[in-house]
Amino acid sequence: MYTIPKKTINTLDDFTLSNLELILSKDCNMACSYCFLYGDTNSGEEFIRWDDLLEMLKNINISDKLTIGLNSGELFTKERLPLVMKAMRVLKRITRYKDTTIDWRLYSNGTNFEVIRDFLIATQGERRTISISYDGEDSYRKLKGNQPSTTLDTLKRLSESGFANDIIIRYAITEKVYNMKETFDALYKLGYKNMEYYFIRNYNSYTVPLVVATFRNSLSDTLKYVKDTDIDLYNLHDYYNKQDPTVICNYGNMLVVTSDGKISTCCAVYEGIYADNVEADLLDYDRIPEIYNNFETSYIYDRSKSECAVCTNQMCKECCSYKAIGRDKYYNKRHLQQCHIRHAELAVYDSIFN
């Protein structure tokens, strides 16, 4: 059975950064349970250690193409936009010291058209993409106070302003997956072509046979529809290009920087819980080999011992990647939630594209 290839990182020179995730703050404006990954989403804590971050980046190897993801509960509010712009200004300085090109990835719930538009206008010379989460009009996503989301209105106005190609739409798989084709069709008619769907990392409904059956039928309808359009469905790249299951994070060349100035290997592992053996202060960046080796020893999932065959499925990233730090053994069997739904997914792709 396929397992994650391990990398040897004995010294700092063995490490080359190609993906950086910076958590700017923890403020979420949505009420759904799956909107944000990092536990406390209303701490108000902002990242302020810019000089220390630059010091680290100057002193480690960086790939000639660096992807920087900026994260928060919601980046695009009037209060947060100055912090986003500052992050981009400061981090661009690294190109003075390193021969690298920066691709920016930013994430949003799409609830403030004016702020997103202003950002896109101000950064037209940058290589940047905004991922906006939208699951259809009957989505579980609500604004706090159980108010309906304004995302669709934002998407309409962004498209009318000429920014559809700067945006990736991310659709979460829930019990309401029956609306996927209709949602993709509505977005396509608005001018959006960059789309993907994703599985929620911890979601018990994936074990329900009716949900799996609904997903299978809806995915089949959606893929047949996509096949006859010029929609760029990112999941299809995984089907065509991957021979083995991959992982959520780029193991061995990624760092996450938290809002309180800690560095670690992968933001997807945490979910609000941190562990001293796989994190270090920004100024202790010489410990990167140590935290990677600890991560490899303690948290990489051993797929060879898995009773869930989904670990051999090339479409799978979330399953069988890493154990969640600080969680019990039952929580860390989350990959079992996806055993059936992931194989249903692959079977649908094979039936249409193989």
What are these regions (language model features)?
Residues 1-21, 62-64:
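N-terminal [4Fe-4S]-dependent radical SAM core
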Residues 1-3, 7, 262, 270-354:
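Flexible mid-to-C-terminal extensions adjoining Fe-S/redox cofactors in radical SAM and related proteins
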Residues 11-50:
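Canonical Radical SAM [4Fe-4S] cluster-binding loop centered on the CxxxCxxC motif
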Residues 27, 31, 35-38, 252, ...:
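Cys/His-rich metal-chelating microdomains
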Residues 29, 75, 111-112, 137, ...:
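Short, solvent-exposed loop/turn segments at secondary-structure junctions
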Residues 33, 76-77:
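Aromatic-lined carbohydrate-binding surfaces of glycoside hydrolases
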Residues 41, 53-71, 78-201:
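Radical SAM/AdoMet-radical enzyme domain recognition
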Residues 194, 203-271:
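A C-terminal junction/extension of Radical SAM enzymes
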